Swiss-Prot record:
Residues 1-11, 84-130, 182-231, 285-353 are cytoplasmic. May control the production of phosphatidylinositol 4-phosphate (PI4P) by the STT4 PI 4-kinase. Mediates proper localization of STT4 to the plasma membrane. One of its GO terms (cellular component) is cell periphery. The modification Phosphoserine is found at residue 208. This is Protein SFK1. Its main location: membrane. Keywords: Cell membrane, Lipid biosynthesis, Lipid metabolism, Membrane, Phosphoprotein, Transmembrane, Transmembrane helix. Pfam families: Frag1. Residues 33-62, 152-160, 254-263 are extracellular. The chain crosses the membrane at residues 12-32, 63-83, 131-151, 161-181, 232-253, 264-284. One of its GO terms (biological process) is actin cytoskeleton organization.
Length: 353
């Protein structure tokens, strides 16, 4: 029997709050249309079964359509913003400020338990930028969906179609950014994972006998080493599967001339859209439990990774002895400040996360 483990935080509920009303709207629309006897509305030009979502949304259910489209859109944007927040400690567009409890702390173990990061921080600036891009692109896409519900197909058909197209394109790009973010995080985590292959050690100064590269960054982008199928990679793969099917069904929706079949694909896409929220919720749940992870606290070193180096205060080497807090040996490897500022000074540098 599968036992539900206590979450690290309750933010994983946010995606569910976002998409459940969306599902409720879709079901309510179908029920209303069926109870009315499957009518063909005055602005429609041919018989079809079923009708498009926007056709029902252009009737007396228009307020429901607008409110639920707006709620779902706001929920998606907040969800991506929370992804950024949990991995960085601040929201997109929010100015960073010094947190003494983090920057002045003396060990990596203490920082893990400090509450600064609710999910594992990103490893490079590329991942940070991808989350931010997903947030911006998703905001534009969801605004387009809201406008498509406001400009009904009955009264503003061309504007409605244009807004739907903008929504599809920008949500595709937003999802691509999330996929790239998770693949990058999975690629870096694979190399430091305790289950990584013993023939690949990115912290070692000696190359393995069957390995031509020392670090992940020296590997070609298409090569992976270590424990490849970690939680980040699995999540990215699920998102790829979701997006691939969504693209196929979106093409069918737009390309098929039979309006009845086209409408079927639109309804399928609308319900399929909720699945991405479920995947994001799983990301939040698993990521929020990283302090209790079977493997994360036993990673020997995150040395050289952007966010972790900053969280460590960067430039002192020390061994953190086993304790009740860290439940294992965590060696925090760092470098002297002159590596980063080309100065001869060995004085430590404090970096605000």
């Amino acid at each position: 029997m599968i036992q539900f483990k206590s979450p690290g935080n309750w933010l994983f509920i946010v995606p569910w709050i976002a998409f459940i009303p969306w599902y409720g709207m879709l079901i309510a629309m179908l029920i209303c249309w069926a109870s009315q006897g499957h009518p063909i509305y005055w602005f429609m030009h041919s018989e079809q079964f079923p009708v498009y979502i926007s056709d029902i949304g252009a009737t007396n259910l228009r307020p429901l359509f607008i409110s639920c489209a707006g709620w779902q859109g706001l929920g998606y944007v907040i969800t991506v913003a929370l992804e950024f927040f949990q991995r960085s400690g601040y929201l997109p567009f929010q100015l960073k400020k010094k947190d003494p409890s983090i920057s002045d702390s003396t060990s990596y173990a203490e920082k893990l338990h400090s509450g600064k990061y609710l999910m594992p921080p990103y490893y490079t600036k590329d991942e940070r930028n991808l989350i931010f891009a997903a947030f911006v692109l998703g905001s534009i896409g969801e605004l387009a969906l809201l406008f498509s519900s406001i400009f009904s197909t009955a009264l503003y058909h061309r504007v409605h179609i244009a807004m739907v197209s903008v929504f599809v394109v920008f949500m595709f790009l937003s999802t691509c950014c999330l996929i790239a973010e998770y693949f990058l995080m999975g690629r870096h985590y694979a190399s430091v994972h305790p289950l990584a292959s013993p023939h690949f050690n990115p912290q070692s100064s000696e190359k393995s006998f069957n390995q031509d590269y020392n670090t992940v960054d020296e590997l070609p982008w298409y090569k992976w080493k270590g424990h490849v199928w970690n939680k980040f990679t699995i999540s990215a793969t699920l998102k790829v599967i979701w997006l691939t099917l969504a693209v196929v069904w979106a093409i069918c929706f737009g390309a098929i001339n039979d309006r009845s079949k086209s409408a079927c694909f639109e309804w399928l896409l609308a319900f399929w859209f909720g699945i991405i929220f479920m995947i994001l919720s799983a990301d939040f749940y698993l990521g929020g439990r990283y302090r209790q992870s079977r493997y994360f606290n036993h990673v020997e070193s995150f040395s050289g990774y952007y966010k972790y180096d900053k969280a460590l205060g960067l430039y002192h080497s020390e061994d953190v002895l086993p304790s009740d807090d860290n439940a294992g040996v965590i060696a925090t490897e760092t470098a002297s400040s002159n590596i980063y500022n080309n100065s001869s000074s060995n004085e430590s540098i404090q970096v605000v996360v």
